[in-house]
């Protein structure tokens, strides 16, 4: 199981938000490219890069800054935030991203997943599913749909998604531990890799995800607040 450090960028700083709220931050640090490099030096085999400005504004911004982070990291990078079109996705793949992460746009228009995966290959297309109380959320967690993660996950899998990044919003950013059951439902019902995210605070949390068969876990706040040592986490997850 891969451990993927999160490098969330806002206003050219590295931040960790509480429950996705731009006004509530656990962490705010300068120089995201250097932070990305630090995680790689500690053993990260992949990085999770999120352009929060792009996610909030609904369009690509800070392209050059993101390119620098991708280019200098030395490991595969999955990038999300503000990717709303086929051309946005292709842009980041051409700039060296290993995977692009689609959010609301893929849930509202699943055909875009098929279009992108037919060009770059499904292994390069990840769709982010965020859920609260068993229902998928869209538009930055501001709207709740009537559908479960498994229902939407199956549609996205059929459309050519190569993996699902699943965030249990009930746990995200609170540093209170995890509930693996919603993630396990996806692992049990889909045939593509599931990347788990949200609420990890201990190596024991990571082992719970490993037990249910997730492909990777994105870890953010717990790394930045020194609740988890990255080297220990990687060792435990092998």
From Swiss-Prot:
It catalyses: 1-(5-phospho-beta-D-ribosyl)-5-[(5-phospho-beta-D-ribosylamino)methylideneamino]imidazole-4-carboxamide = 5-[(5-phospho-1-deoxy-D-ribulos-1-ylimino)methylamino]-1-(5-phospho-beta-D-ribosyl)imidazole-4-carboxamide. GO terms for cellular component: cytoplasm. Its EC number is 5.3.1.16. One of its GO terms (molecular function) is 1-(5-phosphoribosyl)-5-[(5-phosphoribosylamino)methylideneamino]imidazole-4-carboxamide isomerase activity. The keyword Isomerase applies. Gene3D superfamilies: Aldolase class I. Keywords: Amino-acid biosynthesis, Cytoplasm, Histidine biosynthesis, Isomerase. The active site is at 8 (proton acceptor), 130 (proton donor). This is 1-(5-phosphoribosyl)-5-[(5-phosphoribosylamino)methylideneamino] imidazole-4-carboxamide isomerase. It comes from Methanococcus vannielii. The lineage of its organism: Archaea, Methanobacteriati, Methanobacteriota, Methanomada group, Methanococci. The gene is hisA.
């Amino acid at each position: 199981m891969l451990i993927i450090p999160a490098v969330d960028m806002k206003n050219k700083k590295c931040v960790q938000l509480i429950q996705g709220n731009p006004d509530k931050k656990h962490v705010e640090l300068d120089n995201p490219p250097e932070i990305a490099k630090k995680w790689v030096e500690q053993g990260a085999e992949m990085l999770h890069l999120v352009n929060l400005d792009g996610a909030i504004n609904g369009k690509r911004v800070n392209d050059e800054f993101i390119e620098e982070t991708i280019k200098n990291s030395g490991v595969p990078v999955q990038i999300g935030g503000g990717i709303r079109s086929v051309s946005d996705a292709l842009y980041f793949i051409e700039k060296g991203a290993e995977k692009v992460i689609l959010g609301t746009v893929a849930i509202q228009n699943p055909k875009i997943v098929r279009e992108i995966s037919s060009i770059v290959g499904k292994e390069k297309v990840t769709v982010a599913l965020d859920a609260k109380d068993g229902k998928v959320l869209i538009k930055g967690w501001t709207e709740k749909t009537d559908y479960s993660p498994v229902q939407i996950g199956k549609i996205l899998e059929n459309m050519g998604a190569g993996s699902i990044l699943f965030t249990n919003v009930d746990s995200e950013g609170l540093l209170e531990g995890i509930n693996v059951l919603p993630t396990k439902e996806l692992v049990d019902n889909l045939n593509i890799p599931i990347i788990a995210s949200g609420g990890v605070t201990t190596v024991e949390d990571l082992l719970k995800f490993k037990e249910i068969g997730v492909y990777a876990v994105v870890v953010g706040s717990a790394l930045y607040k020194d609740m988890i040592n990255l080297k220990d986490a990687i060792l435990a997850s092998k």
